[in-house]
Amino acid sequence: MTATLAALGITPEALAANGVKLGVKLGDATPFSFDALIERARTMAGQPYTPPATAPADILAKIDYEAHGKIKFDTAHALFADGPGQFPVTFFHLGTFFRAPVRMHVVEKGAAREVIYDASYFDMPADSPARKLPDGTKPGSGFAGFRFQESRLGDQKKLDWKKNDWVAFLGASYFRAIGELYQYGLSARGIALDVAQAGKPEEFPNFTHVWFDTPADNRADSVTIYTLLDGPSITGAYRFVMHRTKGVVMDIDTAIFLRKDIDRFGIAPATSMYWFSETAKGTATDWRPEVHDSDGLALWTGSGERIWRPLNDPPRTMASAFGDNNPRGFGLLQRDRDFNNYQDGVHYERRPSLWVEPLEGWGEGAVQLIEIPTDDEIHDNIVAMWVPKAPARAGSQYRLRYRLHWLADEPYPTPLARCVATRLGNGGQPGQPRPHGVRKFMVEFKGGRWRSCRLV
């Protein structure tokens, strides 16, 4: 191993020095590259799935919502807290709702070293059940996820980096980012498998390993990570290049390999929450006028057509498909930015929009929208994703490149007016008999060339 590292231009002394600077314990160095990670995922796809080892279930059960909330990562142990790069990394702890450990690594000059879990990285009560979890590299030990904190550099600070983060990976293959309004909201996933598919349970593969590229430049506004995806039906290797600029922009390069057939194979999925809005409140009993992280699905088709589909809380699970060929983009957007329309201190008016931009042709398929009934804001009940027309069968391989924009609005807005609200009511005229089965739609447009239109 020493000879291999020497060939890479890395000395054991330099790696040890980095371990001290990083503030965490690091394991032995091993060669790493994205190409090798892709081959690892390819090899795994030809082998039976092995579930990851987890910590003792009785201990995890005691780290419930309340106990988990008392466990805070000590920023003195943050990766890159003193550089290189602008953005330190902190970690989430395991618990009842996040049982699968994720193995974290630091990469420098082609060599990776694992970040060894230690309870001392976290501030927790003396009687916390988390203190009984195994340390080091024992089966079931590890972290649940991670966050990139805001810039540590004085002239770049948007907010105190020790208290504020801008991207988080936590649970299965879920991740999310704040937009330009400094607020978390909807989430993305590495992949979506058989969402709301009749007769089949949805599968949630995990990002089991993460590698953090050591930044080369203190002034860089981007970070690079690599992840390994593993599940009963799938494996995958992902590279994320994430830019902290106006909002957050992520360039994603992934290679995916299927172990089993998938009936609804969702690429670049976005997951959100919609309960009610001005469109229809239904039977929701709530003092607020609107409750949602997103209010519509926007599409820019391969032929250049713009489509806006308001979201709905349906009486039963609904699936809508918008057929297309080489789509230019789609996303779940939050267009209503008026606090008065929400009246809530959690600031739904600041939730980010998420736009998916393919960076190459995706061929034929459909943007599918899944809407699931909900009676509370705590449930994510909306999924939007690209589903290829060709069947996803065992042995299939996919190489995909796309960009995610976490902004207040879509990155390529139409010059025309856009729909910002849709209201439904009974048809007919006030004071007159209402015709049966007739609905009235009031659609509100804003901006663009609308002001120059004449009403006739």
Label every model-predicted segment.
Residues 185-243, 360-375, 379:
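Extended, loop-rich substrate-binding clefts of extracytoplasmic carbohydrate-active enzymes
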Residues 42-198:
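Solvent-exposed N-terminal domain segments of exported/luminal and surface proteins
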Residues 1-17:
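N-terminal export signals
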Residues 19-65, 74, 341, 347-456:
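Terminal accessory/anchoring regions of large secretory-pathway or extracellular enzymes
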Residues 227-273:
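Acidic, contiguous internal or C-terminal segments within carbohydrate-active enzymes
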Residues 66, 164-173, 177-180, 263, ...:
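A contiguous, surface-exposed recognition patch within enzymatic or periplasmic domains that forms
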